Every structure is written in C-alpha cells, then in structure tokens.
C-alpha cells in the first residue's frame, strides 16, 4: 500500500520533472539605459542654438532624454521642431529664450512645433525650467499694425501621448499653447503661464490654451496671467478636462467662438475648481448667429463646476450674436444648439462694471438652450445679483430678468 505521504512526494517529483527550469523561461537579455544628450549652448544671442537642440533630438529622440541643464540659457533664433522625437523626454531645467525679431516671426505659425509625435514629455523635473517667447516687441508691433502675424509659442497637431509639465512659460507673441489636428491623450499639468507687458500695449490674443480638434486632453494645476481666453474650447474639442486652474486678467474659460464660417461642434468638456480673477467673464459660450457665411454651432455635454469669481465682469455669459451687431441678429437670430450645459457651484463677487448684473445669458431664438444652473451664489459689489436672460428655459434654475444681449 502506498501511503498518502508517498503519493504527495511522488506528486512533487512529477511536478518538478514537468516544470521548466528558470533558465528555460527567462530570456537572456540586457536592459539598455536610455540615451541621453545635452546640446552645447552657443553662449550668445547671436548664435542660434536650435540646430544643436535638433541634433540632440535626432541622436537621442528615439526613446531617449534631451537635457537643457539648469543655469544655462539657450538662444532660439528660429523655429524649434520636435521631428525625430518618439517617446522622448525633453527636460528643460534652464532657459529657452526665443529671439524677439518681429521680422523673423512675421507669418510663422509657431515657435515650437510638435507634429504627429507619438510620445513626448516636455517638462521640468525640478520646476526651474523656463520657455520665454520674448513677445514684447510683437505686442508693440501688433498695437501699431493689426495685420502683423504672430506665432503661437507651442503648437501641437496630431500625435498622441503628449505631456507638458513643471514649466514656466512666459510672454508668447500670441497664443501660449494650441492643440489640434486630432491630437489624442495630451496632459498639461503644474504649469505657470504669464504674459505681462512692460509698455502701454497689452499682450493681445495670449490665450493660454486653444484646444481644437482633439480627444482626451487634461489641463490641471495651472496658474495663468494673460489678456485673452484662459482656456478656449475650439471646434472639434472632445473629452477635455480642466481642473484646479487659476486665471488672472483673462477672458475666461470659453467655449468658442463657434460657427464663424463652418458648422462647428464642441462636446464633452468639463471645467471644475477654477478661480477667475479680474477677468471679463469667469466662463461662457460664444457662438455666431445664423445667416451669411456662418455655420451651425453645437455644444453638447459641457459642465462648469465650482468656480470662484473674484472681480470678473460676468460670472457666466452666453453670446448668440458673437461677431455681429444687434441689427444683423434681429434679421438673423442665433441658431446654436446648446444641449446638456450645466453650471453649478459658482461663488464670489463680480466687478462693478455691470453691477448689479452678474450673468448675461442670451440664447438664440432659433436655437436650443438646454442649460441648467444650480448653487449659483455670485453677488455684485452692491450686494445684488441680477441675471439677464433671453430665450432660456423655464427650468433654468435661477430667477431671470429681461435684457440679455450679446
């Protein structure tokens, strides 16, 4: 008779014979370290460091690391193109300073281009990295000549898995960051963005983020000072989240403008935990009216939640006559489709510019106005809180007064 212990031992022997050895299952391989490149800085604004940086991207861009070291200035006198980067890690710990030449930048689309790149980290690990667009001369020239074409600081089109973090970006000639071209999975976090003029000419059109045709874009933990939209959801924006952002001097968190010359759609956008300081509005929607060459504007599933309003002219605004005057819109009413628009948890105090009005909601008479408002506790400096409404639903959620415009 075979004992139970014997059966157990025989079973172990069988298992030991059947199981492959460690050497049979573990491949013989060596993990190679990531390539790392540090471009050589020319040390003078008369030397363009872009070729050296692009050579580093060519050498180390395929899965490697490119380092802009601390306490070092790189002078960029031409467009920096990230072509050649694939899953690369571009670490800015020093200063990238672009030339202020208005002659060179006139008509250029961007200062930094990221086109059809799959995998890019553009970041500062230590938080000391700065990208300086050196835009003062461009702002001054634009004040004299509005036909002057200024570049975007960082232009992302196409591609996926883009991360921009830890940096300070300052003084772009035009927009800070533009995302379009069906870009997917882009994250922007822990950024400081400021456009501050040292002349009487304002830093016009310095949107912090223009988010166009793209999916799954996240903007979080960003402090912005500028003179245009804080974040603009442009045509084609889909699944965009904005949270824990503060904006000073801006035109707000804005959908649009939409419908200027084509049918435009923005959908599935969510903005929460936003602090808006001294801005023309905290949040809003801008759509062109019907008629002429204008297209149909559609905004679906947009939520604005937990906004602190500090000295903004309006807490929330809906414009259905954007870009046209009242006479035009009387003949060609707004026809925008607004569906699933949620505004909730707004607190704070507006500026005295529109006192006692704190919100101006002018939906188009030919359109759809599916808007709900709750927890809206914004006051004007006088202590009143008047909300102007036009063509809004009866279950809007707030008490309306007539006289909406825009």
UniProtKB/Swiss-Prot annotation:
It comes from the Eukaryota. InterPro entries: Glyco_hydro_28, Pectin_lyas_fold, Pectin_lyase_fold/virulence. Its EC number is 3.2.1.-. PbH1 repeats lie at residues 183-213, 214-235, 237-257, 266-289, 299-320, 368-390. GO terms for molecular function: polygalacturonase activity. It is found in: Secreted. Residues 20-49 are annotated as: Disordered. SUPFAM superfamilies: Pectin lyase-like. GO terms for biological process: cell wall organization; polysaccharide catabolic process. Glycans are attached at residues 244, 273, 278, 301. Its main location: secreted. Pectinolytic enzyme involved in the degradation of xylogalacturonan (xga), a galacturonan backbone heavily substituted with xylose, and which is one important component of the hairy regions of pectin. Activity requires a galacturonic acid backbone substituted with xylose. Belongs to the glycosyl hydrolase 28 family. This is Probable endo-xylogalacturonan hydrolase A.
